Each structure stands twice: as C-alpha cells, then as structure tokens.
C-alpha cells in the first residue's frame, strides 16, 4: 500500500473498495504522526474499531473541510459534508 504525507501525517493510502471500507479496522493503533488516507470518501463509521480515532476530511484541493476528534468505536456515521472527497484517520489524541 502506497504512503503519502498529508497534514503532517505519514498515511497509508486506501484506494480499493475493500481498503476504503476497512480503513483502520483490525489494525493495531498507529503511533502519533501515522494514519490512513481514504480516497473517494466523505463519511466513515467506527464499527469493529478497538480504539477511538480522529478524522480530518479534505476537499479536492486538500483543504480541510471538517475535523472530528475522539470518535469512539461503534459509531454509525461521521459525515464530512458535501465537499469532502477524502478522509485522514489517525488514532485519537484525546
């Protein structure tokens, strides 16, 4: 899986349907400064997560359109808004 740097975070890039649906689910908690960038995505869930996450939603110009911190496991839907096209998931810092 390809890695990129975005918003000061080294992130693995989820491109395929399976990678995007899974996100960080089932992965060990990433250390600070690492996460997953999910492309073609404007909403996430935290089913099956074992730790809280932070999510930063970006528009097509990589501008932040929404930031949500401390999303607990088993949350149904976190929506980034109509302009969001990708989301960066990291382990929560809160």
Label the model's feature ranges.
Residues 1-94:
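Compact, glycine-rich, soluble single-domain proteins
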